[in-house]
Amino acid sequence: YVARIVMQNIIKALSKPEDTAMVSIFVPGELLTAAGLTPYSVEAMSCFIAGTQCEQPFLRKTEEEGFPETMCSYHRVFLGASLTGLVPAPKCMVYTNLACDGNMMTFPYLKQKQELSGFYIDVPYEKNEDSIQYVAGQLRELKKYLEDMTGKKIAESAVQQAVANSKQAAEYYSRQLALRKDHDPVSTLTNELYAIFMCHLLAGSKESVTYTKLLLEDVKKAPKGEGLRILWMHMMPFLQQPVKEVFNYSDQMHISTCDFVADGFQKVHHEDPYEAMAEKMVNCIYNGSVGQRIEKAKELAQLTEADGGILFAHWGCKGTIGASGLIKNSLEASGLPTIILDGDGCNPANTSDGQVSTRLQAYMEMLKEAKSHDTLCL
C-alpha cells in the first residue's frame, strides 16, 4: 500500500508540475494537503532517481554549477535533476531552515535560477511557546500564500481536518510502537524509508492515516522473533547492498523503530491547527540542541527493548556527522551498544560496500553474543 502511494506522489510531481509544490522534508504537509497540491521533497525525488541508478549525470551537473562535493548528496542529485530539466519547475516552493543546511543552498538557488515563487519558514533554535507562536504566524501566512498561488480559497475546515488526520496517524503509530518489544514484523529498508515520507510530505492525508492503521494491524499479527532489535537513527541507505542483505526480510535483525519516523509522527498538544503544526516543527528532534535527539533515542530504545543502535552518518549531513560521537557515547553510557555507520543514502560512489559489510557483520555478531549471555562488555 505505502509503496503505491509514494510512487503515485512521485509520478504526479513529474507529470503535473502545475499542481505541485517543491518542499523541504520538514515543511508541514497538512497545509499542502488542504491546498490540494502535490508536495515533493529533495529527499523523496533524489531517492527515486538514485533507485533508477541514474544519479551520476546529475551529480556531475551540480559540480559544473560550482556546488561542493561535501554538500549533501540528496541535494546535489536534486539540483542536477532540476537544472537539466528532468524535474520540471513546480508551481511554487516552500522551504525552511529546519535541520538541514542544504535547504538554504538548494532552494534559494533554484528560486533565483528558475525564477520560481517561494515561501520561507523560519524556525527558531529555542524550543518554547514563543517560538511556536512565531512559527504559527508564519504558517497562517503560508495559507494565504498558497491561496494566491492556486487561486483557490483554503477552507479552515480543510486545514483542521488535515491536522486531525495527522493526530490520528500519530496515535496509530504510537500504538504500534508500544507493541514492538513483543512483535517483530519482517520488513525492508525501503518500507522504512517510505514511512519518512508518510509522516512529513503526506502528513494530513487520508493515506497517512490508512498507512499507520495498516501498520498497527501488521505489527499486531507479527510474532515475536528471535532476532536482534535495532534502533535506527537518521535516514535509510536503502540502496546499499550490505545493509539490504542484513535487514531486508531478515529474521536475524529487525529495525524496531527509527527516530526520524517517530519524530515525524510525534504527538502534538495544541488544539489550534496552525499552532499544532508549529509545535511539530519547533519540537523536532533535529532542531536545537543534540540533547533532544539523544533523549528521544533513549526513550525509543527503552520502549522497543532495542538490543543496539545504528546511527547512519549520511555524506554531507554536517549536523548528524558533527553530533555522532556525542550521540554514540551517550547511548553507550546508558547501556545501548551503538555503531556509527558512515555512508551515503543517495550516491553509492561515496561509500565502500566491503567496509560497511565488515562493520555490520562484526556488530551483529557482537550483539548476538551479548544477547546470548545477557551481558555486554563495552
Segments (PLM) and residue ranges:
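A charged, amphipathic alpha-helical module
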Residues: 1-19, 136, 140, 144-267, ...
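N-terminal signal-anchor module of multipass membrane proteins
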Residues: 1-46
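Redox- and metal-dependent alpha/beta enzyme cores, enriched for Fe-S-associated oxidoreductases
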Residues: 31-60, 231-302
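Glycine-rich, highly charged phosphate/nucleotide-binding loops
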Residues: 65-84, 285-299
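Acidic/His-rich segments in extracytoplasmic proteins that coordinate ligands and/or metal ions
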Residues: 74-148
